[in-house]
Swiss-Prot record:
Disulphide bonds in the chain: C94-C105, C118-C138, C152-C155, C217-C225, C238-C257
InterPro entries with a match to the protein in the record: Cystatin_dom (IPR000010), Cystatin_Fetuin_B (IPR025764), Cystatin_sf (IPR046350), Kininogen_Fetuin_HRG (IPR050735), Prot_inh_fetuin_CS (IPR001363)
Record's protein name: Fetuin-B
Keyword Secreted on entry: yes
Biased composition (Polar residues): 272-299
Domain spans labelled Cystatin fetuin-B-type: 25-139, 150-258
Residues with PTM Phosphoserine: S320
Amino acid sequence: MNVLLLLVLCTLAMGCGATSPPQPAARPSSLLSLDCNSSYVLDIANDILQDINRDRKDGYVLSLNRVSDAREHRQEAGLGSLFYFTLDVLETGCHVLSRTSWKNCEVRIFHESVYGQCKAIFYINKEKRIFYLPAYNCTLRPVSQSAIIMTCPDCPSTSPYDLSNPRFMETATESLAKYNSESPSKQYSLVKITKTSSQWVFGPAYFVEYLIKESPCVKSEGSSCALESPGSVPVGICHGSLGEPQGNQGKIISVTCSFFNSQAPTPRGENATVNQRPANPSKTEELQQQNTAPTNSPTKAVPKGSVQYLPDWDKKREGSQEKDPVETFPVQLDLTTNPQGESLDVSFLFQEPMEEKVVVLPFPSKEQRSAECPGPAQKGYPFILPS
């Protein structure tokens, strides 16, 4: 009995002296795949798209066609979640300077369609009422001309970014001259052409969209008026057309213009946040601008977004060496390539004077997305759905 007791005591002593094996380093929590058609996901997609449109200074408002992928990365307790969304989008007829919500804008008719994809990283902290877009990238391209001809052979031939044809500039200048001649007092000048197309309707016809700015001149001053200041900003957008029917020596010119809301949009800082009501907004914006300034620390740099435009897919195929090239949208958005993730400083979003960081992961590929993704499309034409 004494021998048995001695063995037990020795065993316990050896166990107490032993050290536990080293534990593996903590790994970030895995991404959760979300249902692309759930109201929860669609609400977040709406906020993301509103912020993307609000951040842009050029181009047209983008509308949601469908959610292609949605992931959630839950952070430590009290820090909310980071979301990784891939959105299929369509261009609308509203210019971004109009500050119109995408839900109030009509998408372009089929032969004028511009479609594409946006990837976005979005931060939500419901407890602190913070909705914040740190990064996004979008890639767009016009609908294939061969698809238009096959579907609607009589539709106008769109060349949305082609300014090489001098007739487009002629259409813009002459239609604006017509508008100024009919304006009772104010005069306007051309800023830039934003969209072009042409069609044969009993003769050539040209269509343009262009931004205008207000001239300090009034009609009564005529040629005695000095040139407008170079710093003036666009105040509206015009749609002009010029037609030359066969057998008619004259030109048929038409023009309509709409003006942007003169009231400046609500300040939201250098990067947009939604539904955040800090106690001292000016301090929050100041901190936000400091945080977005270039620094030597990648964890404190908050990137902006961009929108790139690709040529018509037909032109892409013409220059390809492949027999049947597959259409792709090279939308890249990676704040890090480290599979373990890196920290992103979001302290400036919080009212409390403390350091707050979230873990950002490499943007996920679509291979791991939910079976409920992509969601149903608002416009299901195969020609305007990114593959």
